C-alpha cells in the first residue's frame, strides 16, 4: 500500500502494509511517537519542488483537484510495483488519478485515512530525512502566502470591488463638496452678500474668494481667468455699494482655507470620476455604452458584483434601487414602481412622462443582454459594439413612440469563411441537354393534375346544387298538393273555414 502525501517541500510517497488501516486503534497508538511512525511507514520516493513558483503551480493544481506533470511522473514510477492500493487525502484528486492512462490503482480516500495523515503530518520531519522542522515551517508559511496572493489576484469578484468603492466614494464626495460649498457661501456672505446672487457656480465662487480676499480689493483684482467680462463688471460694481459687514484677517484666513478644501475636493472628484469611467470601460463596456458609467456603476454596486447583476432578470434590473417603494406598493395593493436606478439613464430622461415606463422596460431588457455579454463572454468586448447597437434600438423605440425619425442600425463587418470551397459538390444540370425538356414535361404534368382537381371540384359543386334544387322543387309540389286538397274539401262542404268558425260561435 502506497500513501501519497503533499508537503510544502514536495510530494512524498510512503510504503506501508495493506492491513494498516484495518487496525485503527493500534494505528493511533503507533503514530503517537516518531519511532512508531518510522516503523510503520517507509519513504518510497520524494519529488522536491524546484522553486517557489513550481510549488505554487503544483499546489494550485491540487486545490482544483488536478494532477500536475510532476505528480504524474512520480506516480508512473509506481506502476511496476506489486502493490495496487494508493491512499489519497482528497477524493477529487483520487478521481483525477483514476482517469490517468496506464495507472491501475485502487484509490482509498475515505474517512479512515484521516488518522493516518494526522500522524504523518505530526512526524513529517522524522519520516523524511534531511527536512528540518524550521525549514518546513518556513516553506509552509511562504507557500500559504503565495497561494493566498494568487487567489486574490485571479479572483473575478475583486475587480468589481474597485467600482463599488469608487462609486460609493464619489457619492460621499458630492455630499461633502456640496456641504463645504454652501458653508463657504454662508460664511463669506456676511461680508459680501451680493456676490452669492452674481456667481452661481460654487467652484468659481471659491476661486474668486482666493483671488480677491476682502471685498475692498475687488476693483484691483483681475478675474479674467475665472469670470466672463460681464459678470466681472457686475461684481466690481456691486462690491462698491455692498451692504455686508466687515471681517478680520483671521476670519478671512479661515474662509480661504475652507475655499481651498472645496477646490481640492473638486479636483479629486474629477480625477475619481475619470478613474471610474476607465474602470467601467474595461470591465463592463457594453453596459457603459448603454446607460453610462455612473448608472452602470450604481447598478453593479447595488447588486454587489457584475456577476450577480448579470444573473438578474430584466424585470429586477428595471426596479433595482426601488425596493422600498415596491414592497410598500405590494403591501398596500397599489401599482408597483416602473423604474429604480435606471431612471437616471439619459435615454429614460429623454422620454416624456407618458413613455418613461415603456423606455425603462426596454432599456432594462437591453441592459440585461449587455451585462451577460460583459460578464460571461470569452471574447474581447472592450469596444462596446453590442451596447451601442442596443442603445440605437432603444432610441429607435423612443422615436417610434414619439413620432420621430428612426436611426439606422450599425452593420456588423462580414467575416470571410476560413475554408473556401471551389467547384461543384453535386452533378450540374446546366450542362445536360435533356434537362429543359424534362422540366417542361414535368410542368405540363403538374398543370394537368391541377386542372383535373378543379374539374372534380366543380362537378361536386354542381351535383350538390342539383340535389338542393330537386329538394326545393319537391317541397313546392307538396305545398301545391296540400293547398289543392284543402280547397277541394271546402268546396265539398260548401262553406269556408271562416264561416265555419262563426257558425260555431253563434251556436254557443
Curated annotation (Swiss-Prot):
Database matches in Pfam families: Nop, NOP5NT
Gene3D superfamilies noted in UniProt: 1.10.287.4070, Nop domain (1.10.246.90)
First-listed, main subcellular location of the protein, grouped into a coarse class: nucleus
Gene Ontology biological-process entries: snoRNA guided rRNA 2'-O-methylation
Compartment annotation: Nucleus, Nucleolus
Superkingdom of this protein's organism: Eukaryota
Region spans: Disordered: 426-508
Alphabetic keyword roster: Nucleus, Phosphoprotein, Ribonucleoprotein, Ribosome biogenesis, rRNA processing
GO cellular component, one term: nucleolus
Domain named Nop: residues: 283-403
InterPro entries listed in its UniProt record: Nop56/Nop58, NOP58/56_N, Nop_C, Nop_dom, Nop_dom_sf, NOSIC
Basic residues composition bias: residue spans: 473-486, 498-508
UniProt xrefs under PROSITE patterns: NOP (PS51358)
Compositional bias segments (type: Basic and acidic residues): 460-472
GO MF annotation terms: snoRNA binding
SMART domains from the UniProt entry: NOSIC (SM00931)
Modified residues (Phosphoserine): 33, 441
Acidic residues bias spans: 440-449
Entry's family note: Belongs to the NOP5/NOP56 family.
Protein role: Required for pre-18S rRNA processing. May bind microtubules.
Protein name in UniProt: Nucleolar protein 58
Amino acid at each position: 500500500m502506497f500513501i501519497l502525501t503533499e508537503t510544502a517541500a514536495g510530494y512524498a510517497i510512503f510504503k506501508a502494509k495493506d492491513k494498516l488501516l484495518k487496525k485503527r486503534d493500534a494505528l493511533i497508538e503507533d503514530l503517537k511517537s516518531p519511532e512508531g511512525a518510522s516503523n510503520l511507514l517507509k519513504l518510497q520516493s520524494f519529488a522536491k519542488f524546484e522553486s517557489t513558483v513550481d510549488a505554487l503551480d503544483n499546489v494550485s493544481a491540487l486545490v482544483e483537484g488536478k494532477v500536475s506533470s510532476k505528480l504524474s511522473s512520480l506516480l508512473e514510477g509506481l506502476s511496476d510495483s506489486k502493490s495496487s492500493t494508493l491512499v489519497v487525502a482528497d477524493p477529487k484528486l483520487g478521481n483525477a488519478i483514476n482517469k490517468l492512462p496506464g495507472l491501475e490503482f485502487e484509490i482509498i480516500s475515505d474517512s479512515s485515512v484521516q488518522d493516518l495523515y494526522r500522524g504523518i503530518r505530526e512526524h513529517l520531519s522524522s519520516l523524511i530525512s534531511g527536512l528540518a522542522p524550521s525549514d518546513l515551517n518556513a516553506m509552509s508559511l511562504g507557500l500559504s502566502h503565495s497561494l493566498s496572493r494568487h487567489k486574490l489576484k485571479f479572483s473575478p469578484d475583486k475587480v468589481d470591488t474597485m467600482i463599488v468603492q469608487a462609486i460609493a466614494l464619489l457619492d460621499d464626495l458630492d455630499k461633502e463638496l456640496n456641504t463645504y460649498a454652501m458653508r463657504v457661501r454662508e460664511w463669506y456672505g456676511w461680508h459680501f452678500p451680493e456676490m452669492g446672487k452674481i456667481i452661481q457656480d460654487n467652484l468659481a465662487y471659491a476661486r474668486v474668494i482666493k483671488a480677491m480676499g476682502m471685498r475692498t480689493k475687488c476693483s484691483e483684482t483681475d478675474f479674467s481667468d475665472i469670470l466672463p467680462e460681464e459678470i466681472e463688471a457686475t461684481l466690481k460694481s456691486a462690491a462698491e455699494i455692498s451692504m455686508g459687514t466687515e471681517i478680520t484677517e483671521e476670519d478671512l484666513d479661515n474662509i480661504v482655507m475652507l475655499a481651498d478644501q472645496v477646490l481640492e475636493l473638486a479636483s479629486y472628484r474629477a480625477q475619481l470620476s475619470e478613474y471610474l469611467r476607465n474602470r467601467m470601460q474595461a470591465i463592463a463596456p457594453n453596459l457603459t455604452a448603454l446607460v453610462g458609467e455612473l448608472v452602470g456603476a450604481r447598478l453593479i454596486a447595488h447588486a454587489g458584483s457584475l456577476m450577480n447583476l448579470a444573473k438578474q432578470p430584466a424585470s429586477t434590473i428595471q426596479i433595482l434601487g426601488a425596493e422600498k417603494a415596491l414592497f410598500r406598493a405590494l403591501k398596500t395593493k397599489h401599482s408597483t414602481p416602473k423604474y429604480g436606478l435606471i431612471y437616471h439613464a439619459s435615454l429614460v430622461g429623454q422620454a416624456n412622462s407618458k413613455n418613461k415606463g415603456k423606455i425603462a422596460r426596454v432599456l432594462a431588457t437591453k441592459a440585461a443582454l449587455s451585462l451577460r455579454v460583459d460578464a460571461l463572454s470569452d471574447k474581447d468586448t472592450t469596444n462596446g459594439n453590442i451596447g451601442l447597437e442596443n442603445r440605437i434600438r432603444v432610441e429607435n423605440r423612443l422615436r417610434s413612440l414619439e413620432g420621430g425619425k428612426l436611426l439606422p442600425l450599425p452593420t456588423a463587418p462580414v467575416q470571410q469563411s476560413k475554408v473556401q470551397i471551389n467547384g461543384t459538390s453535386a452533378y450540374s444540370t446546366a450542362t445536360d441537354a435533356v434537362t429543359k425538356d424534362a422540366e417542361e414535361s414535368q410542368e405540363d404534368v403538374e398543370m394537368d393534375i391541377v386542372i383535373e382537381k378543379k374539374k372534380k371540384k366543380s362537378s361536386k359543386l354542381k351535383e350538390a346544387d342539383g340535389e338542393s334544387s330537386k329538394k326545393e322543387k319537391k317541397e313546392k309540389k307538396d305545398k301545391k298538393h296540400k293547398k289543392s286538397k284543402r280547397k277541394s274539401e271546402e268546396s265539398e262542404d260548401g262553406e269556408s273555414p271562416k264561416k265555419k268558425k262563426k257558425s260555431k260561435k253563434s251556436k254557443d
